Amino acid sequence: MDQAGIIRDLLIWLEGHLDQPLSLDNVAAKAGYSKWHLQRMFKDVTGHAIGAYIRARRLSKSAVALRLTARPILDIALQYRFDSQQTFTRAFKKQFSQTPALYRRSSEWSAFGIRPPLRLGEFTVPEHQFVTLEDTPLLGVTQSYSCSLEQISDFRHEMRVQFWHDFLGHSPTIPPVLYGLNETRPSMEKDDEQEVFYTTALPQEQADGYVQSAHPVLLQGGEYVMFTYEGLGTGVQDFILTVYGTCMPMLNLTRRKGQDIERYYPSEDTKTGDRPINLRCEFLIPIRR
């Protein structure tokens, strides 16, 4: 395997082990090289020092935990292998220009300081556009669930499948446009979990005959950044992770309060049973510029 292939595999492995001990000796042993050779190879291929990259990714993961859970700051610091809250706070402030406590309390979420994961090889950054929406009345059903930060990606995919299945269970066909409104906040009951509220909804004029027991929902107007995904529905969650983990930091955007909007345009209007359908998804995040 060439050097780029070795480092590509190593980057994937690192991403899944950021909360594990990752001394350069451990990482070099995993890669099968001497510590010195691995450091040089990593720098040659990526342009980054491996130790600084690991620390920046750990701090980025800890930033997400600060925003989406109520875990004590010390617990987050220890989870991402900092030896004390003081050491963590100093490193965090250097990367994010504010303390962990202030970062957690802010009413808005700036992507400044988040270090996206390095990717080698084929990767196209999703295109974006800035849009202003008007208040839009919808009819929908809101459900909620709680999960840990580590479970959230799998849970969100499974939740979407189940909630849409429930929502459209009595409809004869798939409507031409569907809305998923998503809001996440720290759980009030467990400090290591978050509560996710997900609303499946349709424009009011389309709702007749499609859904039962829906309630009025307001899609709030304002400025959003929009990213578009096309493909199988099973790929939506990975796309959203890319938007938050890579696109928002690259654009240095600030997320304001509000719901994320998933606007779906299915390319098939017939139900397919358990088979995933092709669709276009416009994913909109409320922002302040």
Curated annotation (Swiss-Prot):
User: Which regions of the protein are recorded as binding DNA?
Assistant: 25-46, 73-96
* InterPro entries noted in UniProt: AraC_E-bd, GyrI-like, Homeodomain-like_sf, HTH_AraC, HTH_AraC-typ_CS, MarA-like, Reg_factor_effector_dom_sf, Tscrpt_reg_AraC-type_HTH
Q: Mind telling me which residue stretches traverse the membrane in this protein? A: none
**Gene3D superfamilies associated with the record:** Homeodomain-like, Regulatory factor, effector binding domain
Induction field = Transcription is slightly reduced by salicylic acid, and significantly reduced by decanoate.
Query: What molecular functions are annotated in GO for this chain?
Result: bacterial-type RNA polymerase holo enzyme binding; DNA-binding transcription factor activity; sequence-specific DNA binding
Q: Which GO terms describe its cellular component?
A: cytosol
**Which Pfam families does the UniProt record give?**
GyrI-like, HTH_18
Instruction: Say what happens when this gene is deleted.
Output: Deletion reduces transcription of mgtA during late exponential phase of liquid culture.
The name on file for this protein is Transcriptional regulator Rob
Q: What is the lineage of its organism?
A: Bacteria, Pseudomonadati, Pseudomonadota, Gammaproteobacteria, Enterobacterales
Q: Gene encoding this polypeptide?
A: rob
